[in-house]
């Protein structure tokens, strides 16, 4: 029965990972820790010249 329980556990984890955690809520560019890390993330990936954290999301802008 242990193999069956393990298989069910993996199935539940897979379903939760796919549907339960939308990617827009994931931390990006060092947020919420530092606006400086967010700014370098934007410059490095050529998303803009400046970056600012809005919660856990790094927002890049061109100024």
UniProtKB/Swiss-Prot annotation:
Expressed by the venom gland. Residues 1-20 form the signal peptide. Disulfide bonds join 31-53, 38-58, 42-60. It comes from the Eukaryota. Keywords: Disulfide bond, Ion channel impairing toxin, Neurotoxin, Potassium channel impairing toxin, Secreted, Signal, Toxin, Voltage-gated potassium channel impairing toxin. The keyword Signal applies. Transmembrane segments: none annotated. InterPro entries: Long_scorpion_toxin_alpha/beta. This is Potassium channel toxin Sp4. It comes from Scorpiops pococki. The lineage of its organism: Eukaryota, Metazoa, Ecdysozoa, Arthropoda, Chelicerata.
């Amino acid at each position: 029965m242990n193999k069956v329980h393990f298989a069910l556990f993996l199935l539940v984890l897979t379903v939760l990972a796919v549907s339960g955690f939308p990617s827009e809520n994931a931390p990006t560019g060092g947020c919420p820790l530092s606006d400086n890390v967010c700014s370098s993330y934007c410059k490095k990936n050529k998303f803009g010249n400046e970056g600012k954290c809005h919660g856990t999301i790094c927002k890049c802008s061109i100024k």
